[in-house]
């Protein structure tokens, strides 16, 4: 497909394969929750990880002391971008959930990209112009006009035992603020 999303995915796959060839990234060690303004010996590893994933702009050169272990505002913004992209609460804190997402190996990320590219092949060739897209995993819905997002909102989806069905359909009408009674 020639859809821009698919092409971005292919580019990202190429980048991640190059990262894998170069050795990927090492896991960041566990420890207490890192918060902005703190100094922590894990910060250089965090900087490297967020730079290779392009959440943090800059080079892979090590900062000079005392900034090498300081969790500064630029790093906080990068962490929030990473958290947002991975469906985590973008609070800037490196707790267990964020650390787990950061430590997913590059090979697993490549597998995720490949699966999503395959899904895209089935869906994106039919998406153009105006459409609504529900991101079940991200708990949000977006309205696109001329292939650009113009509105996004949080959405409630199913549960593991009552999964939201995946489908595509033409929308004939929308009901805002429907009546709802407790079952």
Predicted regions: what is each one?
Residues 1-168, 172-183:
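Auxiliary tRNA-acceptor-end handling modules of aminoacyl-tRNA synthetases
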